[in-house]
């Protein structure tokens, strides 16, 4: 887990499970479908039902859970997912809350969202 700017951390699933999940004072962006989006919605099929109101993302307290898979083609990623994640990060940081953005391995989805946040901030 690394801090890329003050109070914004990028990591992997293990960082969340072993370091953040049991602490208070954190907001978390789960930038991975498995297992968090599946657990939040409770679906047993390969993917979430497309007509579910939380198909793209679910918010549970200080956790934003994205239906985000690791794909090579960015056209498969809904801009609404990215926009919501960036706003969630901004809102959390503005309220003095530390934020962890994580994916399964911490090598693509989470760092990409962190870089997009930094690029948008200028």
Q: Each predicted region: which residue ranges?
A:
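A short glycine-rich, hydrophobically flanked beta-strand micro-motif that places a catalytic Asp/Glu
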Residues: 101
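Cysteine-based protein phosphatase catalytic domain of the PTP/DSP
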Residues: 2-98, 119-122
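Active-site-adjacent alpha-helix immediately C-terminal to a catalytic or transition-state-stabilizing loop
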Residues: 104-122
């Amino acid at each position: 887990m690394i801090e890329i700017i003050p109070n914004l951390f990028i990591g992997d699933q293990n960082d969340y499970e072993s370091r953040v999940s049991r602490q208070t004072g954190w907001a978390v962006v789960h930038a991975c479908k498995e297992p968090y989006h599946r657990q939040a919605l409770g679906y047993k099929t390969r993917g979430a039902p497309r007509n579910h109101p939380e198909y793209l993302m679910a918010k549970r307290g200080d956790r934003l859970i994205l239906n985000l898979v690791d794909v090579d083609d960015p056209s498969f990623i809904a801009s609404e997912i990215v926009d919501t994640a960036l706003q969630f990060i901004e809102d959390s940081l503005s309220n003095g809350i530390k934020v962890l953005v994580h994916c399964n391995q911490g090598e693509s989805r989470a760092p990409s969202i962190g870089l997009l946040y930094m690029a948008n901030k200028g």
